[in-house]
Regions:
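Conserved glycine-centered short motifs in functionally critical loops
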Residues: 53-55, 63, 102-125, 182, ...
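Metal-dependent catalytic core segments for phosphate chemistry
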Residues: 237-267, 271-276, 280-319
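A short alpha->loop->secondary-structure connector
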Residues: 74-76, 111-119, 141, 240-248
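Charged, low-complexity terminal tails
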Residues: 1-112
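Phosphate-interacting basic helix/loop segments used at nucleotide- and nucleic-acid interfaces
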Residues: 26-28, 32-51, 81-103, 143-149, ...
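Charged, low-complexity intrinsically disordered tails
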Residues: 131-266, 273, 390-481
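Active-site phosphate-binding and catalytic loops of NTP-dependent enzymes
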Residues: 2-4, 24-35, 78-87, 104-112, ...
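Loop/turn-to-beta-strand initiation segments
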Residues: 91-95, 197-198, 249, 293, ...
């Protein structure tokens, strides 16, 4: 059973896609952070860098947008039948762009001039003549039928589209309704863009809740449960426009417990941020995201079944492959991903593990590419990350360790304190009183290991060294005055 749960509060909105009680996808949005992916801006070319084949575009945000020159097409009139072609832009020129990737770290948002307007059943591309279908529609007859229906609707030849997965099984009337809605939207966008000067926000895409409903609420979802009356009404109004037949599947949560708690989802959400992911067999994954790549290590842990080493490795890796695909979706991990499976001698076992991983990734909405599996069980893959990582919305860099995950040891800090004491006394030989403020644990270690040496310094430099305890001080925070 597949459900969508929506938790809407003043401070944040959350959406969870749950399959048979297991959290499969999780989204969060706050007033302080709203995604800009899908937004359309009228921007101004700020600079062009031929060496990287890109332009930086001023769109009115903190960071300038990044636009590959290969992503530039000739602007066209609203719904006009004119030839679409690539051309060069000049500094200071205005351009209509859409955000396709969130600003991450020091990088600005990724932009394109290939505008895509997502409806219920298709994505309209008014400045592009590309036409295609979702790769998840696999039946050839259905693919042919859908393309035929769009031909009957007779879209202008220069207007592109992509038929979405949810269009599977839909009739001409439903598709035509979507086309009319998107054409009307594009006319509004074009008109607004013509009346405004850059930089300007021209169109703001739906918030995270309505995006999830638009992209994931289909006949396979048995229920959409919402815990807010206001949000319930808003979603109903949205569905009346996009898909009335799904209104019967929406439900207002009236339980005593909070929705995510009652559905046993809150604890699963907390586990998204953990480094270790434990599997039912007793094996576990270690997930290490870094600035440049993500490393996932598979460990046998307390694997309970009695197999020989080869079959044990195969069984653990098969279980891990499916869970890894789920974790990539849940955490929205992207970039280069290296998966270190347990070594397997047999080639057929390696192929089967890779097959399970690929099958488990089929429902992933993000673009991905799997390079293969080596004889050492290492899989290299890439996965597109469009939004900011879930973790970055809920956590910030630890001010104590400054994001390292480690602090200097007491032994290291003791050496530092003694060196600083000696340096201070050498530079100020007439100083008769030295005050040292430091962490209590560090002081205990310092006196336990070096009390005699400190007394030696006092005698040699004819001074008094006093210590002040600072219970809230960082272990690396030492003051000598």
């Amino acid at each position: 059973m597949k459900e969508i749960l929506v938790n809407a509060e003043m401070q944040e909105k959350r959406a969870a896609i749950v399959k048979d009680g297991v959290l499969d996808e999780y989204y969060i949005e706050r007033p302080s952070y709203k995604t800009i992916v899908g937004n359309i801006y009228k921007g101004r070319i700020d600079s062009i860098v031929p060496s990287i084949g890109a332009a930086f575009v001023e769109i009115g945000l903190e960071k300038k947008g990044f636009l590959y020159l290969s992503d530039i097409v000739e602007p066209i009139e609203p719904i006009a039948q004119v030839e679409t072609k690539k051309r060069e832009f000049k500094k200071g020129e205005e351009v209509l762009v859409q955000v396709v990737k969130e600003s991450i770290s020091t990088k600005g948002p990724r932009l394109t001039t290939h505008i895509g307007l997502a409806g219920r059943y298709l994505v309209l591309m008014p400045q592009d003549d590309h036409r295609g279908l979702s790769r998840r529609i696999e039946d050839r007859q259905e693919r042919s039928r859908l393309l035929g229906l769009l031909e009957e609707i007779k879209l202008p030849t220069d207007i592109g589209y992509i038929i979405r997965t949810v269009a599977e099984g839909k009739d001409k009337r439903q598709l035509h309704h979507d086309v009319l809605f998107l054409f009307k939207l594009w006319r509004r966008i074009s008109s607004f863009a013509q009346r405004n000067t850059a930089p300007a926000l021209i169109y703001e895409d739906y918030d995270i809740v309505l995006r999830v409903i638009r992209d994931s609420f289909d006949d396979e979802v048995s229920k959409l449960i919402v815990d807010s009356k206001e949000e319930f009404k808003r979603i109903c109004n949205f569905l009346k426009v996009f898909s009335r037949d799904l209104l019967k599947n929406i439900e207002l949560h009236r339980g005593r417990l909070e929705l995510f708690t009652e559905k046993s989802i809150e604890k699963q959400v907390d586990k998204i941020y953990e480094r270790n992911v434990y599997l039912k067999s007793g094996a576990y994954l270690v997930i290490e995201p870094t600035e440049g790549l993500v490393v996932i290590d598979v460990n046998s842990g307390r694997f309970r079944k009695k197999y020989d080493p080869e079959h044990m490795a195969f069984a653990v890796n098969c279980e891990a492959a499916g869970e890894i695909a789920r974790q990539l979706r849940l955490r929205d991990l992207g970039g280069i991903i290296v998966i270190d499976f347990i070594d397997m001698e047999r080639e057929d076992h390696r192929r089967e593990v890779l097959k399970i991983l690929k099958n488990s990734l089929k429902d992933d909405k993000a673009k991905y590419e799997i390079i293969g599996i080596s004889k050492f069980g290492v899989v290299e893959m890439t996965r597109e990350r469009v939004y900011r990582a879930i973790e970055s919305l809920s956590y910030e860099t630890c001010p104590y360790c400054r994001g390292r995950g480690k602090v200097k040891s007491s032994a290291t800090m003791c050496v530092f304190v003694l060196k600083e004491l000696k340096r201070t006394l050498t530079e100020h030989p007439d100083k008769r009183d030295i005050q040292v403020s430091l962490n209590p644990n560090l002081l205990n270690y310092l006196l336990k290991e070096n009390e005699e040496y400190i007394k030696t310094l006092e005698r040699r430099y004819r001074t008094k060294i006093s210590f002040t305890l600072e219970p809230n001080a960082h272990i690396e925070e030492v003051k000598i005055i």
